[in-house]
Amino acid sequence: MKYTIYTDGACSGNPGPGGWGAVIIDEKNKQINISGKENLTTNNRMELTAPIRALGKIKKDSKIIIFTDSTYLKNGITLWIKNWEKNGWKSANKKPVKNKDLWLELNKITKQRDITWKWVKAHAGNIHNEQADKLATEAINN
């Protein structure tokens, strides 16, 4: 099965109450929207939580494309994480990587799946990205 996923995270204050949202679309164009919230978090933690939760809904043998408007998420999972692992989870400036717990969880999940990561510009009219944004924002208040 093939899936396309759009994810987003939001925070009211940083840190503060946060929400995440994901739009999951299968190859038959069936769409599932999921979202959640945390009372005290950061926008980056919500950006990481969204794909973790979305991937938990999909069988491991699926082919997946994930769209995110977060360069932190896309670059972290496709570029930076290899160096973090090599450097004992230290960033380029030798400080501990923030959100290590979520990066470890996301890395474990993504290694078990065929995933292509793509960046999409935020608030640029992409309907599914806008839906993910709305889900994340609305989750904060629900």
Label every PLM stretch briefly.
Residues 10-17, 53-131, 135, 140:
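RNase H catalytic domain
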Residues 1-45, 49, 53-60, 134-142:
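RNase H-like nuclease fold core
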